[in-house]
Amino acid sequence: METARQPAPLQGLRLGYRAGILELLRLVQGAGEARVAALPGGVVSNLIDGLLVLDGAFKPDSQAADVGGGSVVAFTERAPDKDTENEDTVAVIPWGPESVVLVVADGAGGLPAGKRASMTAVSSLVEALSIAMSETVVLRTAILDGIEAANEAVKRLANGSATTLTVVTIEGRIARAYQIGDSEAVVVGQRGRIRLQTTAHSPTGFAVEAGFLDEREALHHAERHLVSNFLGTSDMSIDIGAPIDLRPMDTVLLASDGLMDNVHLDEIIEHIRKGPADAAVEAVVELARKRMHSNNGKEPSKPDDLSLIVFRKRPAARRRSPGKPSRGGAAK
């Protein structure tokens, strides 16, 4: 395997790859602003206020914020009993006061390639969006250009690595999903109705979509682990979803296969469809952990890195008609 170049000096220090990533994350999560460091190739000085990037390399990482006109909780941790680092990377990228970009990347290829691929993809996407923001580029165009740039950046690593990448953009009340690989996105209503569900780019994912398997059968299928589309390859393809209008109290979920391969979709929906977002994340994380450790043959059990984002848009403020008495007082 070819050795990748070391990152450029960050803030005057010459850092190894792992130290450079940790310094990036320290900057990302400090003082309400983020300094986005490109991986091999240089340092980007663009600032995105409120940016969250979760690494969770060796211990669980959880972040919550009010962003994009709603509330978000993001979580990532490595697989149980795993000696190597978590290969997932998660990001929440603000795009103005009422818009946000949610990102889950699940690196493939093993240490250090998997983590490097997912972090490179996320860093490249953040860099592209920060530039597009300053140039007032349309978000859909910025996302597609950013994904293409991320694909080229991972290919340039030349170490055989690749990563999934699932993105959901929320602009006002409009949500749209972009998918490469088997990390998934779901939008559900407060009563549990599925309003959007992406298709995993895998043999079992396509079989479920075509009706040859149901979702419970797919969780136990021998080829569940196979993935047919990755970022970092010459034949990478982007699955672009149709825009949907978010309704009050709709919940948006992005998750790596660490969640989707261990918890049935109806169980996930029951936990996330209502109630505080942080409680929803805690509940599905605990259930996924339990399944990963059980392996009783009855329930799905696939130890893996676990990452998810739960976002819920704030309900629109109700407008009071002119002359209508306010609660507790008469109209003037």
Task: Show which residues each predicted segment covers.
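PP2C/PPM-type serine/threonine phosphatase catalytic domain
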Residues: 1-332
